[in-house]
C-alpha cells in the first residue's frame, strides 16, 4: 500500500510506485514525497584536467544527494572533448567512477578557442550535444556553420551567449551595486545581443537550439517572441537567478558567477518566463572551484558557484511554497522537460524528500568538493532522504 506521496506524470507513476514498494519499502512512509529523479543539463564536473576542484565521482555523488540521476557535463576540461579521442578520456572516467548517469557535451570549437570548428560529424556519435560553455562563439559565420553541421547530424547547439567585446573587464552585473561599490559591471547587452544573433541564425539554419543560464529580461523577451515565431529554441535558468539579485550581493567570491546576479527586474522577468513556459528548465550550472580560487572577493575570485545539492530545496522554498508555481510544475522543470528536450531516457529512478524538514545551508555538509554558494546560511525546506537508480540507492541520508 502506498503511504508516501508520489508527484510524477502518469507515465512514470506506476514504475516509481512499484520500485518504491518492492525495493525501498523503508521509504514508503508518510511525510516523504517521491519524485522522478532530476536531470541537470548544465554541470561542470571538472575531470579530466581540474580534479582539484571536483571529480566525476564527487560531482555525481553531490548530484545524487540533490535528487539527480542524470547530469550533462560541460566541455571546459583538459583535454577539451574536441576529438573522439579526447571525449573518450572523459567517458572512461565516467564509466569507472560516476555514481549516476553522465552525458558529456563536445565542444563546438577546437580547444574552445573559437577559431576552428570541431569535427561535429564524428563527435555526434558520442556527445549529447555541442557547447562551448564558458564563452560564446564570437564569429557569426562559424556559429552558422556549426549550426548547419549540428542539424545535419541530428544534434543540438547549446549556447553560452556572451559578446566578448561588451565585457569590458566586468565581473558583476552593471547595476546599482557595481556603481555604489566601485566594481566593473557586465552589461545585460553582452548576453542578449548574442541571443538575438543566434536566434536569427537558428531561423536561417533550422537547428535545434538551447540557451544556457538566461539571466536578463531582454533575453527572456527575445526567446518568448522566437517561440511564437515557431523557432526551435529552449532555454534554462539557474536557481540563483530566480531567488537572488544584485541587491543581495556581498563582497564575497561566493556571489560571483557568469552570468552575474542581475537586477530585481531581471529576476522578476525570469520568474515570469518560468510561469509562462518561456523558460522550460532549471539547471544549476554547478561550477565548483577550490576554496582558494573563491577566496579573493568579487573582483579576483573565479566565476562559478555550486548548486546540485540545493537546487530542489531552493526552488521549492522560493517558488512553490510562495505560490509562484506548483510542485508539479517544478518537477517538469527539473525532471521531465530536460529529458524530453535532450532526448534522454527516463530511467528507472526516483528520489524521496521530506518537504517539511528545513535546514540551514552549510557548505561543510556538501559532498561536492566545491563549497561556494550564494545560498550559504539561508533556510530551505526539503531534505533528500533517498535517490534510487535501477533498484539501487545511489544516495541515502
Identify the residue ranges that each predicted region occupies.
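C-terminal cap of metal-dependent C-N hydrolases
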Residues: 297-300, 321, 348-397
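Active-site mouth loops of central-metabolism enzymes
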Residues: 41-54, 77, 103-116, 182-189
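N-terminal metal-binding scaffold of metallo-dependent hydrolase/deaminase domains
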Residues: 1-27
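His/Asp/Glu-enriched, well-ordered alpha-helical/loop segment
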Residues: 180-206, 273-276, 280-282, 287-353
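Divalent metal-coordination and catalytic microenvironments
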Residues: 31, 42, 63, 67, ...
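Metal-associated gating/positioning segment near the N- to mid-region
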Residues: 29-94
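Histidine/acidic residue-rich metal-binding segments in metalloenzymes
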Residues: 117-282
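A glycine-rich helix N-cap at a beta->alpha junction
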Residues: 91-108
Amino acid at each position: 500500500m502506498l503511504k508516501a506521496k508520489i508527484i510524477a506524470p502518469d507515465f512514470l507513476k506506476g514504475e516509481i510506485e512499484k520500485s518504491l514498494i518492492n525495493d525501498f519499502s523503508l521509504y514508503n512512509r508518510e511525510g516523504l514525497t517521491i519524485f522522478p529523479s532530476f536531470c541537470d543539463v548544465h554541470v561542470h564536473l571538472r575531470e579530466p584536467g581540474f580534479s582539484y576542484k571536483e571529480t566525476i565521482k564527487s560531482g555525481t555523488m553531490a548530484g545524487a544527494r540533490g535528487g539527480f540521476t542524470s547530469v550533462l557535463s560541460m566541455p571546459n576540461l583538459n583535454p577539451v572533448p574536441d576529438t573522439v579521442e579526447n571525449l573518450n578520456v572523459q567517458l572512461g572516467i565516467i564509466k569507472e567512477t560516476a555514481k549516476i548517469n553522465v552525458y558529456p557535451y563536445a565542444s563546438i570549437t577546437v580547444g574552445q578557442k573559437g577559431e576552428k570548428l570541431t569535427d561535429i560529424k564524428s563527435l555526434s556519435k558520442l556527445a549529447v550535444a555541442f557547447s562551448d560553455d564558458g564563452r560564446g562563439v564570437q564569429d557569426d559565420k562559424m556559429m552558422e556553420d556549426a549550426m548547419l553541421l549540428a542539424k545535419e547530424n541530428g544534434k543540438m547547439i547549446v549556447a553560452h551567449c556572451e559578446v566578448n567585446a561588451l565585457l569590458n573587464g566586468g565581473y558583476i552585473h552593471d547595476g546599482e551595486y557595481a556603481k555604489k561599490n566601485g566594481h566593473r559591471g557586465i552589461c545585460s547587452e553582452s548576453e542578449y545581443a548574442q541571443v538575438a544573433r543566434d536566434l536569427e541564425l537558428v531561423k536561417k539554419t533550422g537547428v535545434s537550439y538551447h540557451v544556457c543560464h538566461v539571466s536578463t529580461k531582454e533575453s527572456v523577451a527575445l526567446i518568448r517572441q522566437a517561440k511564437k515565431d515557431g523557432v526551435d529554441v529552449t532555454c534554462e535558468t539557474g536557481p540563483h537567478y530566480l531567488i537572488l539579485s544584485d541587491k543581495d550581493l556581498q563582497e564575497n567570491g561566493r556571489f560571483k558567477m557568469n552570468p552575474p546576479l542581475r537586477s530585481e527586474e531581471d529576476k522578476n522577468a525570469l520568474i515570469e518566463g518560468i510561469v509562462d513556459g518561456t523558460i522550460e528548465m532549471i539547471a544549476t550550472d554547478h561550477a565548483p572551484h577550490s576554496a582558494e580560487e573563491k577566496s579573493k572577493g568579487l573582483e579576483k575570485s573565479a566565476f562559478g558557484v555550486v548548486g546540485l545539492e540545493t537546487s530542489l530545496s531552493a526552488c521549492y522554498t522560493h517558488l512553490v511554497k510562495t505560490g509562484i508555481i506548483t510542485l508539479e510544475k517544478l518537477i517538469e522543470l527539473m525532471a521531465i522537460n530536460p529529458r524530453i528536450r535532450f532526448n534522454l531516457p527516463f530511467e528507472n529512478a526516483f528520489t524521496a524528500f521530506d518537504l517539511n524538514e528545513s535546514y540551514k545551508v552549510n557548505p561543510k555538509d556538501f559532498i561536492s568538493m566545491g563549497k561556494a554558494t550564494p545560498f550559504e546560511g539561508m533556510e530551505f525546506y526539503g531534505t533528500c532522504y533517498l535517490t534510487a537508480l535501477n533498484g539501487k540507492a545511489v544516495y541515502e541520508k
